[in-house]
């Protein structure tokens, strides 16, 4: 029995697509481990994430991928192993698992190899590693700038004829927004807020519309007294916090185009930017990037699932993948 998978292991979430079935798993890239005589898996995914701040002693809650890089290969291996166990049927005969796995385009050779090693130890028999922008070229089917902005990193790449001409991975994405909001509220309102509150602010009122009048009531803890404190946060206030973050990304795009060969730069300018990833869903971002760069911006359908959708298409096209990666044999 052969199981054909596409796997997107992000710093925030891991998504698995099974050929013939679609997306079969989407869970936080988090695992809780207990260290006794041997390591014991306490919880994985959403259940493990709910344990943050609630465990002590010999139990740890671990995020094994940080900024797109594997920082705890043993923990990630156990996490992927558990995820695979969930989606593979129980059988006397162990299935042969083939997997196409996307990674950020800016990883080193050693960092890329680490994904292959972890997947192999987790029970994947045949592994193909592909840069996320290359995978997305199958979905977009045209040349241009691919921008994938997720939880921890943003990939920006000029893609031409299924090849990355210029590409970079930046540690500027959803987590950077959360941290900027936390720092701002600490400085301006003299409060500490929970991570869940930060996420709520981002999801409900963060936008790149400078005149957005939305606001939200927030509960935090006063830094000086430790008492609970209620205060109002406006979308306009958050705009001033997050716009410099995206300013960095647009500066990279403009710089990247200036170094690209003339013909490719002209073609890229004509086709514009293809935007996806969870953070791409911030209201007004497409228009803001278009205004800052002077380029057309296309927000892909279901942006948070664009990478796994592209991988899913490629999982049934092994010859296409071989061509993309210049391989003679998969």
Where are these regions (language model features)?
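Nucleotide/phosphate-binding catalytic cleft detector across ATP-hydrolyzing
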Residues: 1-149, 159-273, 280-302, 307, ...
